[in-house]
Swiss-Prot record:
GO terms for molecular function: bacteriochlorophyll binding; electron transporter, transferring electrons within the cyclic electron transport pathway of photosynthesis activity; metal ion binding. Pfam families: LHC (PF00556). The gene is pufB. This is Light-harvesting protein B-875 beta chain. Residues 46-49 are periplasmic. A bacteriochlorophyll binds at residues 21, 39.
Length: 49
């Protein structure tokens, strides 16, 4: 187990934090792409201004 001195304020080690960040970012990019495409499609269909 990691020493308390190895843990950040989140309770994760540096390696765990980097792994969590990479998983989060790998999900964020596809979500953002789908959101942008959806907004463009709705704007083309029915502009809101």
């Amino acid at each position: 187990m990691a020493d308390k001195s190895d843990l950040g304020y989140t309770g994760l080690t540096d390696e765990q934090a980097q792994e969590l960040h990479s998983v989060y970012m790998s999900g964020l990019w596809p979500f953002s792409a789908v959101a942008i495409v959806a907004h463009l499609a709705v704007y083309i269909w029915r502009p809101w201004f």
